[in-house]
A protein has these predicted regions:
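A structural signal for short hydrophobic beta-strand segments in well-ordered beta-sheet cores
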Residues: 25, 144-146, 197, 209, ...
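Well-ordered alpha-helical segments embedded in enzymatic catalytic cores
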Residues: 33-36, 88-91, 196
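Catalytic-core segments of class I nucleotidyltransferases/pyrophosphorylases
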Residues: 100-102, 109, 115-122, 136-138, ...
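Phosphate-binding and adjacent anionic-ligand microenvironments
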Residues: 243-337
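Conserved beta-loop-beta/alpha segment of the NTase-like Rossmann-fold superfamily
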Residues: 60-148, 183-185
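Structural beta-sheet core signal
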Residues: 5, 51, 103, 128-131, ...
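N-terminal glycine-rich phosphate-binding loop and ensuing alpha1 helix
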Residues: 1-61, 269
Length: 337
C-alpha cells in the first residue's frame, strides 16, 4: 500500500527545538519524528512511501536514504515553491499512479491503526476518508461534523466556542481515492481543509469520517513536544525508542556546585535529552512562568520527576546557573503537565 508523508514544513513554531534541523529530524525517544512515522506506516502495511519535502530537504534525504533501513521503499518529491497540503500531494501524482493513497502529516505523533483506516475507506466508497479523534481542546483544531453513518457534512476550521458543535478533530491523516486527486489543480498552492474538502462536499462527493482509538497529538510547539515526550515515557504513546536511548535507575542528579535546590532522580537526565527550555538569566520562577513568555538564554532541562528540575551543566552557559532562583515544581506546573 502507498503513503505520502508530508515533511516540507520549516517548524518555526517548534523553535528552538528545530534550530539547525528540519522538523522531521527533531527527535522523540532518541529517534527522528519521521522515523517513528515510517515505522508506524510499515507496521500497518504501507511499505511504499513518498515524502514531500521543501525546507532542508537534503538533510532529510541524507538521514533516511532509500528507506531500506526503516523497512520501506522511500522516495522524495522536492517542492521548489510551497504548494500547500493538497498541492504537494498532487505533485506526487506519478507516484500515486491512479491508486488509493494514505496521506499522513509529519506534524503529529500517533499510534493509530492505519490499516483499519484503510479498510474503512475501501468499505465506504468515499472520495476521502478522514481520520478523526475526539478532543477536549476543540478550539485548537479543525473539526468535522458527521451524521450517524459517519458521512462528513461540514468542516469547521479552528472555531470559537459558540461554533463548537462536535469534538471530532481532523487529525490530518487521510485516505484519498483517485477521483479526489483529480479534483486538485496542478502546479499551484492548494489546501485540503480550506479548499479541496469544501469543493468536494459542494459537488456532492462522499467524505467519510472514521473515528480512531489511540494516541494522537499535534507537535507544533515546544510545549506540545514536551508533553508528547512525557506521554511516550509514561506509556500513553506507543513508540520504539532509538538504540542509544536508555535510562538507568541510578541516573545521577545535579552536581552540588550548581547551587540549586534540585533533585534529579530516575529519568531526569533522560527527560533532559528530550526537551530543553530556554529561560531568562537571574530569573525567579517561584510564581510559575508560561513557556511562551520565556526569553531564550540559559538552558534548563526539565526532569521527568514532577517536582524536580535539572540544570544542564554541560551547557556553554552553565556558569550562570547560580544566578537562577527556581521553584522547580512551579516551573513544571506552569507547563500544565
Amino acid at each position: 500500500m502507498k503513503a505520502i508523508l508530508m515533511a516540507g514544513g520549516e517548524g518555526t513554531r517548534l523553535r528552538p527545538i528545530t534550530h539547525g534541523a528540519p522538523k522531521p529530524l527533531a527527535e522523540l525517544l532518541g529517534k527522528p519524528m519521521m522515523g517513528h512515522i515510517l515505522e508506524l506506516l510499515r507496521r500497518h502495511g504501507f511499505d511504499d512511501v513518498c515524502a514531500t519535502l521543501r525546507y532542508r530537504g537534503g538533510d532529510i534525504i541524507r538521514a533516511f536514504g532509500d528507506g531500506s533501513a526503516w523497512g520501506v521503499r522511500l522516495r522524495y518529491m522536492l517542492e521548489t515553491e510551497p504548494l500547500g497540503t493538497a498541492g504537494g500531494v498532487k505533485n506526487c501524482a506519478d507516484f500515486i499512479d491512479g491508486e488509493d493513497v494514505l496521506i499522513i502529516s509529519g506534524d503529529a505523533a500517533c499510534d493509530f491503526d492505519l490499516a483499519a483506516l484503510w479498510r474503512a475507506h475501501r468499505a465506504s466508497g468515499a472520495a476521502v476518508t478522514v481520520a478523526l479523534r475526539r478532543s477536549s481542546e476543540p478550539l485548537r483544531y479543525g473539526l468535522a461534523v458527521t451524521d450517524e453513518s459517519g458521512r462528513i457534512r461540514s468542516f469547521i476550521e479552528k472555531p470559537d466556542w459558540p461554533h463548537v458543535v462536535t469534538d471530532f478533530v481532523n487529525t490530518g491523516i487521510y485516505v484519498l481515492s483517485p477521483r479526489a486527486l483529480d479534483a486538485i489543480p496542478a502546479g499551484r498552492p492548494y489546501d485540503f481543509g480550506r479548499e479541496l474538502f469544501p469543493a468536494l462536499l459542494a459537488s456532492g462527493e462522499v467524505l467519510h469520517g472514521e473515528v480512531l482509538e489511540g494516541y494522537w497529538r499535534d507537535i507544533g510547539t515546544p510545549l506540545s513536544y514536551y508533553r508528547c515526550c512525557v506521554d511516550a515515557l509514561e506509556g500513553r504513546l506507543q513508540l520504539t525508542p532509538g538504540e542509544a536511548f536508555a535510562a538507568s535507575p541510578e541516573t545521577p542528579g545535579c552536581p552540588e556546585d550548581t547551587g540549586l535546590r534540585c533533585d534529579c532522580r530516575d529519568r531526569a537526565a533522560l527527560m533532559g535529552t528530550l526537551a530543553e527550555l530556554f529561560l531568562p538569566l537571574g530569573a525567579d520562577f517561584s510564581d510559575g512562568i508560561g513557556l511562551e513568555s520565556a526569553r531564550f538564554s540559559l538552558h534548563i532541562r526539565p526532569s521527568a520527576v514532577r517536582d524536580a528540575v535539572c540544570v544542564d551543566v554541560r551547557s556553554p552557559d552553565a556558569e550562570f546557573a547560580k544566578e537562577l532562583s527556581l521553584s522547580a515544581k512551579a516551573v513544571i506546573d506552569a507547563l500544565n503537565l
